[in-house]
Swiss-Prot record:
GO terms for molecular function: pyridoxine 5'-phosphate synthase activity. The gene is pdxJ. Homooctamer; tetramer of dimers. Pathway: Cofactor biosynthesis; pyridoxine 5'-phosphate biosynthesis; pyridoxine 5'-phosphate from D-erythrose 4-phosphate: step 5/5. 1-deoxy-D-xylulose 5-phosphate binds at D14, H15, R50, H55, T105. Gene3D superfamilies: Aldolase class I. It comes from Nitrobacter winogradskyi (strain ATCC 25391 / DSM 10237 / CIP 104748 / NCIMB 11846 / Nb-255). It is an enzyme of class 2 (transferase). The lineage of its organism: Bacteria, Pseudomonadati, Pseudomonadota, Alphaproteobacteria, Hyphomicrobiales. This is Pyridoxine 5'-phosphate synthase. It is found in: Cytoplasm.
C-alpha cells in the first residue's frame, strides 16, 4: 500500500466509448486515449463493463489489459458473468459497483451490508485469484464495517453527493456530505482498509479531497473527458495532477 503522502490518479475512459458508440465503429479509440492519459501522468486506467454494454465493450477490456502498462481497474456489477470475465482478464483490480439499467450513471454506493452473504463468496473468489477487490460505497459506517468484514482490501468512497452539492452551491448539504467523507475515510483506515474516492470530481473538488491523508487514489472520468474535448487529454491529465498535488501539499504543510 502506498504511504499517506502519495496520491494516485486513475482515469476512467468510459465516456470515450460513449462518444464512439454514438456513431458505431472504432473511433475514438479507447485504448489510444488511455495510453495518452498514461503518457501524461495518469497512474492507472478505470473502465466499467456494464451488463448492457452501453459504453465499454468486452474487447475494450481485453485490449486495455494487453496494451497498457499501468494498473487496470475493472468496474463491474457483482454478477457471475462479470466475475467470469474478470477472472479471464486478470486486471490489477476489480471495483464492485451497483448497477441499474435505467440509470444514466452509477447513482449510489453498493449495499455491502445488505448483500453481505452474496458478496462474501464472490469477493473471496476474486481475492483467491490475486485480483484486488474494491467496493464502491457511501461514506457510511455500516457499509465501511461490512467492507472490512468481507475482506475487501479497498473501498472507493462515492463522492457524488458532495460534488453535486458543491456545483449547485448548496453549502449546507456540501458541508454535511464533506463531514461524512472525512469521517468515513478515517474510519476506513482505522479498520485497515485502503481508501480511494471518486464520482463527480472536478479540478476544485479533487484539490480539496486530495488534502485528506487517508485517500490514496482518485478515479475521475466524466469531467476529464469533457475537458479533453476542449484542451486535449494530455493537458487535462496534467491540470488534474497539478490540482491534486496542490491539495496534497497542504497535507505536507500541516504535518511538517
Amino acid at each position: 500500500m502506498s504511504s499517506s503522502q502519495s496520491l494516485r490518479l486513475g482515469v476512467n475512459v468510459d465516456h470515450v466509448a460513449t462518444i464512439r458508440n454514438a456513431r458505431g465503429g472504432d473511433r475514438p479509440d479507447v485504448v489510444r486515449i488511455a495510453l495518452a492519459a498514461i503518457a501524461a501522468g495518469a497512474d492507472g486506467i478505470t473502465a466499467h463493463l456494464r451488463e448492457d454494454r452501453r459504453h465499454i465493450r468486452d474487447s475494450d477490456m481485453a485490449r486495455l489489459k494487453a496494451e497498457i502498462e499501468k494498473p487496470l481497474n475493472f468496474e463491474m456489477a457483482a454478477t457471475a458473468e462479470m466475475q467470469g470475465i474478470a477472472l479471464a482478464t486478470q486486471p490489477h483490480a476489480v471495483c464492485l459497483v451497483p448497477e441499474r439499467r435505467e440509470e444514466l450513471t452509477t447513482e449510489g454506493g453498493l449495499d455491502a451490508a445488505g448483500q453481505y452473504n452474496a458478496l462474501a463468496p464472490f469477493i473471496a473468489k476474486l481475492n483467491d485469484a490475486g485480483i484486488r477487490v474494491s467496493l464502491f460505497i457511501a461514506a457510511d459506517p455500516r457499509q465501511i464495517e461490512a467492507a472490512a468484514k468481507l475482506r475487501a482490501p479497498v473501498i472507493e468512497i462515492h463522492t457524488g453527493g458532495w460534488c453535486d452539492a458543491v456545483v449547485e452551491g448548496d453549502s449546507g448539504k456540501a458541508d454535511a456530505e464533506w463531514r461524512r467523507i472525512v469521517e468515513g475515510a478515517a474510519l476506513a483506515r482505522s479498520v485497515g482498509l485502503e481508501v480511494h474516492a471518486g464520482h463527480g470530481l472536478d479540478y476544485a473538488t479533487a484539490e480539496t479531497i486530495a488534502a485528506l491523508p487517508e485517500i490514496t487514489e482518485l478515479n475521475i472520468g466524466y469531467f476529464m473527458m469533457g475537458e479533453a474535448l476542449l484542451v486535449g487529454i494530455a493537458e487535462t491529465v496534467r491540470t488534474m495532477r497539478a490540482a491534486m498535488d496542490r491539495g496534497r501539499a497542504t497535507l505536507k504543510t500541516r504535518t511538517a
